[in-house]
Amino acid sequence: HEGYVVGGCIRDVLIGIAPKDYDVTTSATPEEVMSLFKKTVPTGLKHGTVAVHTHDGAYDVTTYRMDGEYEAHRYPKNVIFVDDLVEDLRRRDITINAIAYNPEKGIRDPFNGTGDIRHKIIRAVGNPILRFKEDALRILRAVRLSTTLNFNIEENTLKAMVETMDGLRFISEERIREELNNILLSKNPARGIRMLFDLGIMKYVLPELMTMSGFLQHNPHHDKDVLGHTLEVLTHVPADLPVRLAALFHDSGKSLFVDEAYFRSRISESILTASAW
């Protein structure tokens, strides 16, 4: 059998970031993987994934596969195990996540993810509309990676994100919240939040905030609209989640109510409670 380290960990190494974890893809079936290692946990046999426990941690090992039709805007209804690494990489979301490495065979990069890393580009693998229709959370993931890596999103990929963003209606609050939190905790949260507004995606994330864009404050101490001021505050506060959430919401009542202080606190409380922050 052959195996490759794959995905975000390879991307991070090539960029110069220490990976948080490592994923492995292999030609071995889940049953064969379990027979090869002493301690394994069948964490996702339906999709070909087995957790292999070693002396230095656990690693998700997944059989090469092709995905069938997606259900619930998240998972394929069925998968087909294959013996071709390229077919496995073809199903992945963006090119910089579709790079594999084997110590003997080196880098496998059929979709030029390394080139996109060099040019700092976020680009969907294959048909971008299909990629985002399969799992609309990939739209937020593209924004998050663009924010955290300071990469630009390729034009066709960006157009597909806008065309398919209605699929975010079917994504759970928990998954959306995780991506938003990662954007807020990045080195440039204002970039990510601005992108969510500019593309119209924020109406699926925190629709209550949409009125901040374009709302002028008519105050000599504020030369920006509410959104512009909020983004400036986000840029200057520490990378602490409660602090950055407070910065995001601190003027959210201005564009909706006259009694700003009261309604700002009520809006923030209701949004945070509903979203389980």
Regions found by a protein language model. Name each.
Residues 1-277:
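Catalytic cores of the polymerase beta-like nucleotidyltransferase superfamily
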